[in-house]
C-alpha cells in the first residue's frame, strides 16, 4: 500500500520574503506524486488563496488554507516565534483573515507583522495550530534547555486549541532539528499531544535551492557571499514525495499519519463567482427596483429639458418616446440581471463628487453606451445622439458584472474614496493589491547583485534585453544575437542569465491598484484579509483584482485622469476672472460642440497640450483629416492606432471624407444601402465595434446581444467558430432576402475590420474631453496653458515643449519671482503666465509655503530682507542658491530693471551679486533670529543701518556671470533655459549653414542640416559588436533623436558629449515608435569644424587705439595659440583712413569658441564676427 502524507507547511512565491513555489507547477507536481491534498501557509498572508483554491480543485487536489504567523513573546524583549494555523471551516477562515488583517493594521513593528497571543486566543475557533517546530516558542524553549517552559507553553496552547493543537517536527538537515524533535516526542508522550511531521517546503525540486537562496538574498539586499546574510534554509526543503517523508520519519509513523488526519479535518468551501453588493439605502415603502426606475425617469426628464426643450422641439412627443423606449429597455435588462444596486452605488458617489467640487469625466469605456448611466449622471454623453450601444456594455445574452471605469480629477479622487468608506463603513471599503514581479531587465540586475557580480557587467547584460512591453528573457535570447554571443563567451554573464531565467516572473513586491476599490456588504475580512503599510495607511485587499472579484466582491474603478485636473485648474482661474467682471461661471459641460475657433485650432494641428492629440503623428493625421465636427474627432481617436494606420483604413477614411474616393457602404464592389445609416458617420468605413454589431443586426437579424457575441468571436479568430458564425450570418441575411455572395463578402470584410474596431463609447467620451481641452486652448489660452504647465511641472521634457508652445502662442510668460509666484503656474491680472516656484528643482511645497507666508507682510525688498523674513528652517542654503540661479530672486538684486531690455542687459551682473551676497544674507538673518529669540536688543547689528543703505555695496564687484554660467544655472534649476539658450550665442552664424530649426524638419530623403545642443547620449553595440549611438538634439525650437550607426559614430565619437553644440547632417524620417521624427546621421561637426569648413573668414573691426604696444603683442600671441585654416580679415580704422586688410596664410586660425570669446572680451562683441560664404 502506497504511503499517505500531506504537506502542511509550504510557502509559495507570495510569501515575498522567501518561497519559490509557484501555484501551477505545485499542482502539477502534486498530481504527478498522487498526493490527495496540500496546505499553503504563506508568511503573514493569504494572497495566493484564490489561485491556489481554483487550481487545486481543478486538479482534484484538496486545498487546505492556512498561514505562518509571527507570534509576540510574553517578554517584550524576548525573541519572536512562529505558529502555523490551518483552516478547518468557514468560521476558521473568518478568524484567520481577522488575525492576519489585525496583524497588518495593529501589529506592525520594525517591518514585521506580529500577532499578539491574546488575539489568537480570542479567534481560535475553526483553526488547527501547528507549533512551528524549532521556530515556535515551544521548540525554542526546548533548544534553549528549558523543558519546563516548553511544557507550560504546550499546556497553554492545548487549552486554547483543545484537540486542535499539534507538536510539529521536522528533519530538514538544519541545525537543532533533531534536538527539537526529541524534545517534542518526549513532551507528546507526557501530555498526550499528537505529533505532526512537516517539511517546511520552500521550493518544488531539490535543485531549486540555489535559486531560492538567491531570491532570499535579493529580498534582503545582500550578496550570497555576504557573511551577514541569513542562512535559514537547506536543500532538503523541497516538495518531497509521500514515500520520502514516510522513510524520513519511519521511526515516528504517527507523525506522518496525522498529516492525513489533519487534511481530513480541514474542509473549507470557498464560494467563487457569486457577487455580493452592499445594500443601497432606499426610501421606505419602495423596492430597490421601483426606486431605480424612479430615479432613472426623474433623471431623464432633467436631461430632456436641455436636450429637447418642449417649447422649441418639433415632434417633441415622438422624439421623447425614443428615449423612453430605450430607457425602459435598459431598465428591464438591468433589473432582470440584478444590477440596480450597482448602478445606484456608482450614481451616488459620482453625484457626491460633482456636488463637492471633484470633477468627473464624461465617461470611459463601454459604460458611455448606457442611457441609464446618462440619465443618472454617471456619464455625460447622450448615447442616442452618437449611436452608442447598451449591449456593448451589458449583454443580456452573456451575463457578467457591469464595470464602470470612472475618471476623477487627480486632486479629488481620494476624497471620493474617503466618502465611500465613510458611507459604507471603513471596515467594508478597501483598495486592491497588485503584485510586482521580477521582470526581464530587472531580474538580471537583481541576480547579478545577489551573486556579487560587478555593476558594469549587470548593466551591460541588462541593457542587451530590449525595453519592450511583454519582453521575456527567452524572447530576448531568441531575437538578440549580440546577447546570445555575449552569454556564450562570458562565463559570469552565463551564470547570471541561468539564474535569472529561474527567477523571472517570481512575485517580488506588492503595490496598490491604480483605481480599483471594493465595497463589501459586511466587513471586508469576511471575504479577504487586509494588507497595509506599517503606519496602518493604504489598506488593500490581499487578493488581486481578479481574485477579489472571484471571491465575491465587486470592483469599482476610481481612476485619476490628469486632464480633468487641468480642466479644473483652468476653470478656477477663468471663473475667478469672470467673477471680477460679473460674468456667470463657465461650466465646461455646456460649451458649444460646434465652435468654429476650436475646429480652426484643430485643423491647424495646434494641439500641443490638447488631450490625446499631442504627438507629432497625431498632428500629421489631424492636418490630413481637417476635422470639422465632433464625430470626426471621435473617429480620429479610434483611427490613430497601429491597426488602422497600417491597414490603409486611415487613408481610405480621409479620401472618402474629402471626396477623393467613392462613398460606399461598406465597399464599392459589394454595397448594401441598408448600412448607410450605420456607416455614414465614418464615410462607409467599419471603424467601431458598435458598427460590427449593427451590421449583424441590420443585415442578418441578430439581436444586439447576439451581435456582441459575434463581435467577440471575431476578435478571437478561431477558424471553427468563425465558419459557424459565417454560416449563421449568411442564413440570417437570406431571411432578409440578401444575396449569399453579398452576405459572404460583407461578412469577410466585417471580420477583417473587427480586429481593428474600437469601442465607440470610449472614443466618444474621450473625444469629448479632447474637444473640451481644445476649446479651452482656443478661448482661454493663458489659464489653460498655466494649468497644463502646473500638471507637468516635474516633467522637464514636457515643460520645455510647453514653454516653447507658450512662446509660439505669443502668450506672455513671467520668470519665477518670489514676490509674485505661487507654487503652481498662475495667470496674473494682466493675463501673463507667472512661472510656478514649485517647478524649480529642490523647491518643494514647504519652502514655497515659507515664502508665501512671509510675503503676506509685503513684498520682499532685497535678499537680506528675504532671508530675515522667511523661515530658514524650511529654506536652506541649497534652496536659496536654486532660487537665485533660476531667476526667482532677480527682482531683489541691485541691478534689476522693470524695462525688459535694461533687465536683460544687467541680468548677469545682478545674479552674480546675489550669489556673492548669499552667505552674508543668511548669516545676518540667523544672527537677527538668535538675538530676537534671546530677547536682547542687538545694539550693533542693524541699529544704525540707514533705510536706503546699499546692502550690496561690498558685493557689487563680483565677477559677472557669463551667458553659459547663467544658462547652466537655469538648466540646473528649471530643467530648461528661460532667459536664453546656448544656441543664442551662435544663432546668427548657424543660420548661415543650418537654415532649418528642429521644429521645421520634415521627412525627406535629401540630406538636411540642423544645429543644436546634445542633451542626451546613449551608446550601445550592434549585432557585430560595433558601437553605435543615439543623441537627442535641442535647438530651443524642439528636440529630435538622432541615430549614428557604426561608421558615423566612429567618425564623430570624440564630438559626442552632453551639452556640446554640434552641426549634424543626415536624413529625416518618421519614427513610428515615438510618433515623432528621427534623424539618421551621416556627419557630425563641432561648431569649430563647421566654421572652418563653411566660414569665409574671421572679421575684426579695429581702430588705432586697439593695436598699441601690449595689445598688439597680446593679439599676436593669442592668434599663434589658435593656428588653423580659417583666414582673418581686419577692417582697420585710423584717424586718417579706413582700410580692409587680409592677414597672410601664416596667420590662419582655428575659429574656436575660446578664441572668439577672448577677442570679443578685448575688442567688443560687435567688432568680432565670422563671415560666411
From Swiss-Prot:
Keyword Cytoplasm in annotation: yes
SUPFAM superfamilies: AF1531-like (SSF160975), PHP domain-like (SSF89550)
Reaction equation(s) it catalyzes: DNA(n) + a 2'-deoxyribonucleoside 5'-triphosphate = DNA(n+1) + diphosphate
Compartments where located: Cytoplasm
GO cellular component, one term: cytoplasm
GO biological process, one term: DNA replication
InterPro entries: DNA_pol3_alpha_NTPase_dom, DNA_pol3_alpha_thumb_dom, DNA_pol3_finger, DNA_pol_IIIA_C, DnaE2/DnaE/PolC, DNAPol_HHH, NA-bd_OB-fold, NA-bd_OB_tRNA
Molecular function terms from GO: 3'-5' exonuclease activity; DNA-directed DNA polymerase activity; nucleic acid binding
The protein's Enzyme Commission number: 2.7.7.7
Key word Transferase present: yes
Pfam families attached to this UniProt entry: DNA_pol3_alpha, DNA_pol3_finger, DNA_pol_IIIA_C, HHH_6, PHP, tRNA_anti-codon
Record key words, sorted: Cytoplasm, DNA replication, DNA-directed DNA polymerase, Nucleotidyltransferase, Transferase
Function statement: DNA polymerase III is a complex, multichain enzyme responsible for most of the replicative synthesis in bacteria. This DNA polymerase also exhibits 3' to 5' exonuclease activity. The alpha chain is the DNA polymerase.
UniProt record similarity statement: Belongs to the DNA polymerase type-C family. DnaE subfamily.
Subunit structure: DNA polymerase III contains a core (composed of alpha, epsilon and theta chains) that associates with a tau subunit. This core dimerizes to form the PolIII' complex. PolIII' associates with the gamma complex (composed of gamma, delta, delta', psi and chi chains) and with the beta chain to form the complete DNA polymerase III complex.
Alphabetized PANTHER family for the sequence: DNA POLYMERASE III SUBUNIT ALPHA (PTHR32294:SF0)
The name this protein goes by in its record: DNA polymerase III subunit alpha
Organism per entry: Pseudomonas fluorescens
